[in-house]
Amino acid sequence: MQIILLDKVVNLGNLGEVVKVKDGYARNFLIPSGRARRATEANKAEFEAKRVELEKAAAAKLAEMQAQGEKLGGTTVKLTQKAGVDGRLFGSVTNHDISAELTKQGFPVLKSQIRMPNGPLKTVGDHAVSVALHTDVAVDITVTVYGETA
């Protein structure tokens, strides 16, 4: 299916590009989430009329996320979990826990924006975690996990 992208989509394209994707991906994800429209002649004409407005909105959103990224960069999140004597946690620290703590600190971040390359944190200590605020803005933060004796 041919679609027009209304926003930048990772590994697919930028705003305004006409790309071909599988029907299910377009029908079930891109179109309902407002990231794309079918590439019909009427939709192409409508998009060209709104192109400048959409580009301004995308640039404003990017600038806002870059500003938030500068504030968030280098932040340390401190969490306490029950741990054994050897430093392994009885549970794990997930992106949900990190998101909740960042929100308490005044940085509203969704759990889907937190990238944990090695999966949930299962040991005590400092861990590097990435926060993807926008497709072009990713910030590294430090998560410090303290052990609490059970």
From Swiss-Prot:
Q: Which InterPro entries match?
A: Ribosomal_bL9, Ribosomal_bL9/RNase_H1_N, Ribosomal_bL9_bac/chp, Ribosomal_bL9_C, Ribosomal_bL9_C_sf, Ribosomal_bL9_N, Ribosomal_bL9_N_sf
Positions of transmembrane segments: none
For this protein, the record's Gene3D superfamilies field holds:
Ribosomal protein L9, C-terminal domain, Ribosomal protein L9, N-terminal domain
Which GO biological process categories is it annotated with?
translation
According to the UniProt entry, its GO molecular function terms are: rRNA binding; structural constituent of ribosome
State whether keyword Ribonucleoprotein applies: yes
Q: Among its keywords, does the record have Ribonucleoprotein?
A: yes
Entry GO CC: ribonucleoprotein complex; ribosome
Q: Which domain of life is it from?
A: Bacteria
Q: Which UniProt keywords apply?
A: Ribonucleoprotein, Ribosomal protein, RNA-binding, rRNA-binding
Q: List the disulfide bonds.
A: none
Q: Which family does it belong to?
A: Belongs to the bacterial ribosomal protein bL9 family.
Protein function: Binds to the 23S rRNA.
What name does this protein carry? Large ribosomal subunit protein bL9
State the organism named in the record.
Polaromonas sp. (strain JS666 / ATCC BAA-500)
Taxonomy, top ranks, is:
Bacteria, Pseudomonadati, Pseudomonadota, Betaproteobacteria, Burkholderiales
Q: Which gene encodes it?
A: rplI
